[in-house]
A protein has these predicted regions:
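Bacterial signal peptide processing site
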Residues: 21-24
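Alpha-helical structural signal in soluble globular domains
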Residues: 67, 71, 78, 129-137, ...
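Extracytoplasmic "Venus flytrap"
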Residues: 37-69, 94-100, 123, 189-197
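Beta-alpha junction/loop-to-helix N-cap segments that form part of ligand/metal-binding clefts
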Residues: 60-63, 80-153, 162, 220-227, ...
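Bacterial N-terminal signal peptides that target proteins for export
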Residues: 1-10
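Signal peptide-proximal N-terminal region
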Residues: 36-42, 66-91, 208-211
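Extracellular/periplasmic Venus flytrap/periplasmic-binding protein
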Residues: 105, 148-150, 157-262
Length: 262
């Protein structure tokens, strides 16, 4: 039997910053002279980024935070003027540690601090509960990587997603597996998070529609480091491929343990 391949999909960080702030005011009849604008002190505008900068996926959270910092530096370098006033965007960075309770506490804190927008949160499990709070206080929420469809099913007009959702991602991975030569049977492992479960459910449905046989569906947690018991059980089913619904911080160790098992 050939070794099964590991099909993974982890959160990829991408940041798009759309800057806008201030109350709506009538447009002036003529642009203010540059000297007049420059003479006034720039208004400091808080722009937030929230995600896990500690814990197992801190590397992703830090990448997103650095992306926001770079974007705001570029915007500030242009000496932006909004409503005739010079403004400077000030980053407000918050660490939710990938924890839903911390995410909701941060969301309320950002509402109280009058942040004009937030890039975050990174995971579906943190983005969904936080979105309700951002909606209530009117802060635009831009998530770079939360994929669970429930995030946007609420219909909140202030919530934006910069990545395809699980329905699209799970289907794409399943269709890829079905077209891959030699893949007839698959096993699934998911981390029981909103992301992992959602991706795995769609993958299973579409995989079976495309003629693949799902021979096992195992569960782990997003904190696990030892996958040997799960992989040993899966090995007896002899799948051609394994779908892991989780993040790269666990996919790497899982792949190494697969190789150890042969």
């Amino acid at each position: 039997m050939h070794k099964p391949s590991l099909l993974t999909f982890g959160a990829a960080a991408a940041v798009l910053v759309l800057a806008g702030c201030g109350q709506k005011t009538p447009a002036p009849a003529a642009s203010a002279p540059a000297s007049a604008v420059a003479a006034g002190e720039a208004v400091s505008v808080p722009f937030a980024v929230a995600g896990p900068t500690s814990g197992g996926i801190a590397h992703i959270g830090k990448d997103v935070e650095n992306g926001v910092r770079m974007a705001l530096d570029e915007i500030n370098a242009t000496k932006p003027v909004i409503g005739g006033k010079a403004v400077t965007f000030k980053i407000v960075a918050e660490d939710d540690a990938g924890d839903p309770k911390q995410a909701t506490a941060i969301a309320q804190k950002l509402c109280d601090s009058k942040a004009v927008a937030v890039v975050g949160h990174l995971q579906s499990g943190t983005s969904i509960p936080a979105s309700r709070i951002y909606h209530d206080c009117g802060i635009p929420q831009i998530t770079p990587s939360a994929t669970n469809p429930d995030l946007t099913k609420s219909g909140y007009k202030n919530v934006f997603r910069l990545i395809a959702n699980d329905n699209q991602l799970g289907a794409a991975v399943a269709e890829f597996a079905a077209k891959k030569e030699g893949v007839k049977t698959v096993a699934i492992v998911d981390d029981r998070t909103a992301f992992g479960q959602g991706l795995a459910a769609v993958f299973k449905q579409v995989a079976e529609k495309n003629g693949l046989q799902v021979v096992a569906h195992e569960f782990t947690s997003d904190k696990a480091v030892d996958f040997m018991p799960i992989l040993t059980s899966i090995k007896t089913k002899k799948p051609d491929a394994i779908l892991f619904g989780g993040l790269d911080s666990q996919a790497g160790p899982m792949l190494r343990q697969m190789q150890q098992l042969g």
